[in-house]
Amino acid sequence: MRRFHPLITGTLLLTAVGFFCRILGFFYRIFLSRTIGAEGLGLYQMIFPLHGIAFALCAGPIQTSLSRLTAASPEKGRAFLRVSLALSLSIALPLTSLIYTFADFLAARVLLAPECAPLLPALALSIPFCAIHACCCGYYYGLKKTAVPAFSQVVEQCIRIFSVLLIVHVCHTNRIPITVLLAVWGLLIGEAASAVFCLLV
C-alpha cells in the first residue's frame, strides 16, 4: 500500500482539524455573543493583544527553535523539550505574576479599558499553559508527528466549549449573573486541558 509523504499527510490533517475547529469556534462565538452580549464580546476581544504579546515573549520563538532543533536531531528531542519547557516557563511565570498583580494598571493604562481589569487575572493564569502547549507542539512538529498538535487543538476547543456550557448551566440553575469572565475561564480551562493532553501523550 502506497504511503504518502509525511508533509502531505501532516498538512492535510492540520487543515482538516483547523477547519473543524473553525466551525466549532464559529458557533461558539455566536453562543458567546448571545450569552454575554456584544459589549461583553468586545471586552473579551480587547484582552487578546496582551495575551498575544505574552505568548510572543514566552513561547513563540522557543516553539520555532525547538521544532527546528528536534527536526535536525530527533534523538535529542526530549532533551531539547525539557530545556525549552524550563526556559519558556521561566519567562511565562513572571509574566503571569506581573499581569495578575498589575491587572488594574494594565487595563486602565495599556488597554485603556478599566472594565477589562477583572478579566486579566484569569487570562494571566492561562499563559503558563500556553507556553507548555506551544513547546510540546514544537517538539512534535519537529518529529513530524502532527497528529498530537492537531488533536490538542480539538481537545482545547471542545473542553473550552463544554466548560463554558457547564458554567452557564450552573449559573442559570443557581441564578448567578453571567459576565464576560465566563469566556476567559473557558479560555483558561481549554489551554490547561490541551497542555495536559500534550504532556500525557
Residue ranges with predicted function:
Residues 1-24:
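N-terminal membrane topogenesis motif
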Residues 8, 45, 76-90:
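Interfacial transmembrane-helix starts/ends
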Residues 32-52, 115-117, 179-184:
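Interfacial/gating helices of multi-pass transporter permease domains
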Residues 45-69, 125-128:
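Small-residue-rich midsections of specific transmembrane alpha-helices
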Residues 94-117, 171-172:
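Short membrane-interface helical motifs at transmembrane helix boundaries
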Residues 97, 112-136, 162:
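Alpha-helical transmembrane segments of multi-pass membrane proteins
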Residues 130-152:
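Membrane-interface junctions at transmembrane-helix termini in multi-pass inner-membrane proteins
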Residues 152-166, 174-201:
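Hydrophobic alpha-helical transmembrane segments
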